[in-house]
Amino acid sequence: MNGILNILKPPGMTSHDVVSVVRKKLNMKKVGHTGTLDPNAAGVLPICIGQATKISQFLLDGKKKYRAELTLGIETNTEDIDGEILRQREVTSSPDEIREAVLSFIGEYKQIPPMYSAIKIKGKKLYELARQGVEIERAERTVTIYHIEIIEIFKEKVIFDVLCSKGTYIRTLCKDIGEVLGCGGVMSFLLRTASSDFSLDTAITIEELQALENVEDILLPMDYPLQHMSKAIVKSAYSKQVLNGNRIYSNYLIDTIHEPIGQEVCVYLEKEFVGFGIVRNEDHNQKYIKILRLLFEKE
């Protein structure tokens, strides 16, 4: 079984808990998620199954969309409402000042990842060190906030939708907004509404998954999140060359290679998605596709 499930992770479960549920349901080991969602957060968690685990990096690299609630006037050790309160301050900013501060984060900005995170430094996850009372210096990371829409500002609460790059911590965004306003802030609610091409309206709950007799009925194809990529469709006569990982020349294809040098493409054998390639150039300026990864299972 190969494909992707769009799971609605409930609060209270880790992303790995969801993977374990799917493994047990399918009686398969080759199952993986595509980007950790905080245990207390809910939302879209695409789960790759079988050969689809080989494309998980493409999903990890995709944009994410969240609905979040920021509570101003509080600072905690975890940067969310569930942590130990370190400091409380009065919120004196007006709604207009709050709006301006929130929207000022649109674009690229440098984040320092929270100590309570799954990032590994020298083989240790940061949250493991944090639980031991150890805090270490973390390098800044550049993230991108593509869009923010403020839904509501009510007293110290701000509800907003945010579209962001991979690796963006919404907890840290909330903390940073609070710092700009001089009162501190924490994330008090988080729902991931989209991850790459997967959205909340097509996600299924754990209960719905458990009730299914045939999971393949809702399994999405491996190339579902890759529709933005160019396709190189190989004629069936050249199947052996493709499956052996040989170079793919224009005459092997239904259509010629139009993509520029260095562009990655999805490789199909007729209608079957079989892997990834990259456009290269020979010395005599003949383009070809070099196979980067094959997804088929050898028999």
From Swiss-Prot:
CDD domains for this protein: PseudoU_synth_EcTruB (cd02573)
A Pfam family reported for this protein in Swiss-Prot or TrEMBL: TruB_C_2
Reaction equations catalysed: uridine(55) in tRNA = pseudouridine(55) in tRNA
Recorded superkingdom: Bacteria
List of catalytic residues: D38
GO molecular function: RNA binding; tRNA pseudouridine(55) synthase activity
Enzyme Commission number: 5.4.99.25
GO biological process: mRNA pseudouridine synthesis; tRNA pseudouridine synthesis
Gene3D superfamilies: Pseudouridine synthase
Enzyme class: isomerase
InterPro entries found in the cross-reference section: PsdUridine_synth_cat_dom_sf, PsdUridine_synth_N, tRNA_psdUridine_synth_TruB, TruB_C
Record keywords, A-Z: Isomerase, tRNA processing
Keyword Isomerase: yes
Described purpose of this protein according to its UniProt entry: Responsible for synthesis of pseudouridine from uracil-55 in the psi GC loop of transfer RNAs.
PANTHER family given in the database record: PSEUDOURIDYLATE SYNTHASE TRUB1, TRNA-PSEUDOURIDINE SYNTHASE
NCBIfam families: TruB
Similarity section: Belongs to the pseudouridine synthase TruB family. Type 1 subfamily.
Protein name (database record): tRNA pseudouridine synthase B
Organism: Alkaliphilus oremlandii (strain OhILAs) (Clostridium oremlandii (strain OhILAs))
